[in-house]
Amino acid sequence: PVVKLSANFGIQSATYVPDVVTDPIQYMNMRNQAELNEGKLTVTYNRDDILEYEEGMKHDKYIYPASDWYDLCYQNGFLQQYNARVSGGTDKISYSLGGGYMNQRGIMVANDDAERFSWDMKINAQVTKRLKVGVSLLGNLRYNTDPIYGVSTTVNVINRALPIFGTQLPDGKWLSTWLSTPGRNNPENPLMELHEGNTKRQFHRILGRINIGYDLPWGIKYNANLGYVKVDHYSKDFKHAMYTYNPKTLERKNFSAYVSAKDWDNNAINYTFYNTLSWGKSFGGNHNFNVMVGTEYKRYDGKNFQAKKRD
């Protein structure tokens, strides 16, 4: 037999993120200047607040944060993958057995990971002079975890976050900001959305196939193929109640003040069977005549279930 082993490792990172302003003083001054350029008579951030913020940054990172949200929410991901295979045989039978494992830690700092187990088996045998049989079976089991609002929404929240938005107090309270910004009266905290809930998915797939070939008299060939596919897909969403706090007053604001859980399950089985009789003959050197008849049978059984609870 021949044995093959392989291992692969990789580091992942965001290939590109926007070059945003992370200095809160620069951000507030630039926003004010943009509003004046538009012809507005008043600006968002008054001078006293900007001066207070600039001085406060020297003493209190919670009330006067300078949040770089790309640095806070992204990390280097890590990927590892292992595979093993054994193969061999004789002139009448051959076999191949393989298995693999993959583990991936995503580039977001929480609820961003995946895991996969895979395996396969193939056997081909010349049972008699006329009969040939092949069997194959393969499957995989996958797990992955995503942020509760989904990857695209979470990335959008990170992109929109401002450097004046707070992160988290040592006691676990998620912060917002004491400054008022038009259109951001209930500001998102990207770290809160990454940590306070997730979607966990499990996907299991099995594929099996049996091939039979038999040479009948008079040059007639019989072929049969039986296939089986089973899929199980399970998903669970869970979201905590989300609150943010004014870092100055500790006034609580309801961002998403409910707890919810949702389970979703889907099961499907697919059967296929087809068989053929074929005959062919060559004549005249460059002429071929072929005839084939066959039948096919397919069956699909599926069911799904979903339940949701919200408090």
Positions of predicted regions on the chain:
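Short coil-to-beta-strand
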Residues: 91-96, 246
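Outer-membrane beta-barrel initiation region
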Residues: 74-76, 86-90
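Short, surface-exposed loop/turn segments at beta-strand-coil junctions that are enriched for proline
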Residues: 213, 217, 280-282
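Surface-exposed loop/interface segments of Gram-negative outer-membrane beta-barrel transport/assembly proteins
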Residues: 4-65, 107-207, 223-225, 229-311
